Amino acid sequence: MYPNSPSLGRIPLPLPCARQQQTSAYLSKVPVSVAPDLLSPEQFFQASLNIHKNANLPRLLMNGNVLTVPPLSSPPWSYLNHSPLISPGSPPSSFQNRKRRSDEGNSPYDVKRQRFQSPQEQTVNHQAVPLRGDIRCSYPGSPAFPLLQSPSPPVLKGHSSNSGDCWLYDHIDTTLPVAKDKLSKQILDLFQALQQQVCDLKKKDICRAELQREIQQIFPQSRLYLVGSSLNGFGIRSSDADLCLVLKEEPMNQNTEARHILSLLHKHFYTRLSYIERPQFIRAKVPIVKFRDKVSGAEFDLNVNNVVGIRNTFLLRTYAYLDKRVRPLVLVIKKWANHHGINDASRGTLSSYTIVLMVLHYLQTLPEPILPSLQKKYPECFDRTMQLHLVHQAPRNIPQFLSKNETPLGDLLLGFLKYFAVEFDWSKDIISLREAKALPRTDDYEWRNKYICVEEPFDGSNTARAVYEKQKFDLIRAEFLKAWVALRDNRDLYSLLPVKGIMKKMHSL
């Protein structure tokens, strides 16, 4: 399926030469059980020069010129090949700004050269032709096109191989509640059309594994995690996939280190990987690189070291399967919010993560709670200092929460809308999943002068900080009130959503 497979006619990779074995021996001395804050680039460069002192080191070029990267103050990550972009032994400028001479031979790795048509049409230089729709290819200097051999990256302690994480497909009880009324049945029918399928998750994880393989040639101690709705049980078939690249388990400055790393990866994706389409570097509070995987068709958002996203993914995943009603209720509410224009943090409304926290909070605060506070009930499973490679294992043995509350899905949806339309005090209260209740606002900066306050369960930040305009806050409250009145009077999901149209679209995916 991937480059160097028999179907592509590539010859097997040669055995490493003596010089490469020396490099591997050097790298093997680096312990892999600790965070990758081991070598600065300067230290690594010096060690590499000692190993390769009689060899011609490859040059790092960007747009035909040697790239000089301004050093950060004691950066905690290290490069394997001195930089993200490694050229073959011959100068890469031989591929640029000239026509091919008639006396140049055709090697097995010759590829057609393409120019970028426009910044909006970001295809890849040196694209091989033709590319089948079900393969992923890389270009000269990338690990799948090894004109310059490099040692294989180490496997981090506690992790599975690059082929994927087998625990993703562990059996989970996904039986659904019995619907005894029309509205509950409509919710279940829509949920079954919306929910992410196992095949959708596998496609995303295959791309994650292939990207991790590429990135580990640049940052050998790194690990790429699939996070967010794709993994927490609340994803729909059309959900974007969130990726978190972890270089160290300590906090990273998102304005300097993370931006610098993402800019390097953006350049690498842009020029080396044929299966990455439209990579965009977004300089937000948590910077990301957005791109599309041509093979799966999935959209991805890649961040660096935003490790709280890994922890809350598995917290929410545990909540998702505690009670059979949780996932259907959350997915239908997310779809309602999206359809009515209040589910877009980039436009000053609610993020999907915030909406999920609001639904879970409501289920915790019922007179007979459907959900507990997992962080209070099982603190050892959700310790925010736990090593990342243990985070997915800790909640595995938590049993289902046996609630005495048997309220049907239709009534829960109506109650959720009523709670935030007329009962919750937006001006005085903080939504807290960690405490399983509404907390009184304090005068802390995080909550001061905010229209909506939703506590992030691990770092205590406000996940609803994007709602900073009164106009958007009024819109959100108005949609809750309008939906509650419509559903109260009609008891029909069609009064909130064009259900048939949504289901038809989902079935076509």
From Swiss-Prot:
Residues 409-462 form the PAP-associated domain. Mg(2+) binds at residues 240, 242. InterPro entries: MTPAP-like_central, NT_sf, PAP_assoc. It comes from the Eukaryota. Its EC number is 2.7.7.19. The keyword Cytoplasm applies. Residues 88-125 are annotated as: Disordered. Induction: Autoregulated; mediates its own polyadenylation and translational activation during frog oocyte maturation. Belongs to the DNA polymerase type-B-like family. GLD2 subfamily. Cytoplasmic poly(A) RNA polymerase that adds successive AMP monomers to the 3'-end of specific RNAs, forming a poly(A) tail. In contrast to the canonical nuclear poly(A) RNA polymerase, it only adds poly(A) to selected cytoplasmic mRNAs during oocyte maturation. Plays a central role during oocyte maturation by mediating polyadenylation of dormant mRNAs, which contain 5'AAUAAA-3' sequence in their 3'-UTR. In immature oocytes, polyadenylation of poly(A) tails is counteracted by the ribonuclease parn. Component of a complex at least composed of cpeb1, cpsf1, tent2/gld2, pabpc1/ePAB, parn and sympk. Following oocyte maturation, parn is expelled from the complex. Interacts with rbfox2. Interacts with sympk. PANTHER family: POLY A POLYMERASE CID PAP -RELATED (PTHR12271), POLY(A) RNA POLYMERASE GLD2 (PTHR12271:SF40). This is Poly(A) RNA polymerase GLD2-B. It comes from Xenopus laevis.
